[in-house]
């Protein structure tokens, strides 16, 4: 099936599946097959924020006074989050847009990816405000084995889908020899690649960020690195929306009544999906061990974080129809909910700047040239 950015075939988009139907031609929103994506778009747009709105001048002082093992925890999490959102800032567009068939879903994917680029910019904003040589941090991301090992697992499902989709668009279904390699291209296998990719993305949004989130909020609970925590809180709000979107996509695919042609695929991939979540959970526990290898921080340690990972893994798997693999039933760090559920938080403005408002709109930098027009 040859891909075109604008199909001249007139069609009724209400009868198209989410994926692998006719590519979107007219981006129209007066009629929608799945209104949830329009609601997600509107919500994400209402969330719009910029990292520069948050003043990090106090965080610089806080960071200098952290013990070395806490600096390791803080910086390592920023490195990992930078990697995750570097992938998420581009991959949904590259992997999903060429096969999407609904305008509301197409626009949601673009809106989602754009918000991820704001997250990437945020980590740069944080790093260059607390560290004199930011390149030392960014240059280590690729070289750090603890980060790189997880990157392979994250990118694999995207890459597999992108590769097979490219072949499908160029050569169509059938058996082909490409660069001396025999490849079978069929829609069933392509749908399977898509489904596993969506499960992988869901696991990423559902679990992979939350060790870093917990650490950032634990610092702020001690009134340390509070500017960073305000930014991470905004990121966490976005990620919760992205998680909701992937859960909706998957549950729509699961429902036979929607005629998406994917319910058999979900059953076929059931075991692999279950073990994918377990693997992600195990990787995050290993990451927690790496973070706390030189010491714990007040209110948080490797054991507590591992329990929290199991707790949220149970919830996330249940949300998409998978059984809960762990026995833990209660949240071992309930205080984190006040950071993740923004409506729970009321902050006195005189005590600390409020992250629910646009802040830092005034440029606080003053140079000698700013006083040239002043007369005494």
Curated annotation (Swiss-Prot):
Q: Name one GO biological process term.
A: deoxyribonucleotide biosynthetic process
What GO terms are given for molecular function? metal ion binding; ribonucleoside-diphosphate reductase activity, thioredoxin disulfide as acceptor
PROSITE patterns xrefs? RIBORED_SMALL (PS00368)
Tell me which domain of life the UniProt entry assigns to the organism this sequence originates from: Bacteria
Q: What's the cofactor?
A: Fe cation
Q: Which reaction does it catalyse?
A: a 2'-deoxyribonucleoside 5'-diphosphate + [thioredoxin]-disulfide + H2O = a ribonucleoside 5'-diphosphate + [thioredoxin]-dithiol
Between which residues do disulfide bridges form?
none
Catalytic site: 123
Q: How is the cofactor bound?
A: Binds 2 iron ions per subunit.
Enumerate the residues binding Fe cation 1.
Answer: 85, 116, 119
Q: Does the keyword Oxidoreductase apply?
A: yes
Q: What are the entry keywords?
A: Deoxyribonucleotide synthesis, Iron, Metal-binding, Oxidoreductase
EC code: 1.17.4.1
| InterPro entries the UniProt entry points to | Ferritin-like_SF (IPR009078), RNR-like (IPR012348), RNR_small (IPR033909), RNR_small_AS (IPR030475), RNR_small_fam (IPR000358)
Q: Which residues form a coiled coil?
A: none
Residues that hold Fe cation 2 according to the record: 116, 205, 239, 242
Pfam families documented for this protein: Ribonuc_red_sm (PF00268)
Q: Which PANTHER family match?
A: RIBONUCLEOSIDE-DIPHOSPHATE REDUCTASE SMALL CHAIN, RIBONUCLEOSIDE-DIPHOSPHATE REDUCTASE SUBUNIT M2
Q: What does this protein do?
A: Provides the precursors necessary for DNA synthesis. Catalyzes the biosynthesis of deoxyribonucleotides from the corresponding ribonucleotides.
**Family to which this protein belongs:** Belongs to the ribonucleoside diphosphate reductase small chain family.
Quaternary structure, from the entry:
Tetramer of two alpha and two beta subunits.
The protein's name: Ribonucleoside-diphosphate reductase subunit beta
Q: Which organism is it from?
A: Buchnera aphidicola subsp. Baizongia pistaciae (strain Bp)
> From which lineage does this chain's organism come?
Bacteria, Pseudomonadati, Pseudomonadota, Gammaproteobacteria, Enterobacterales
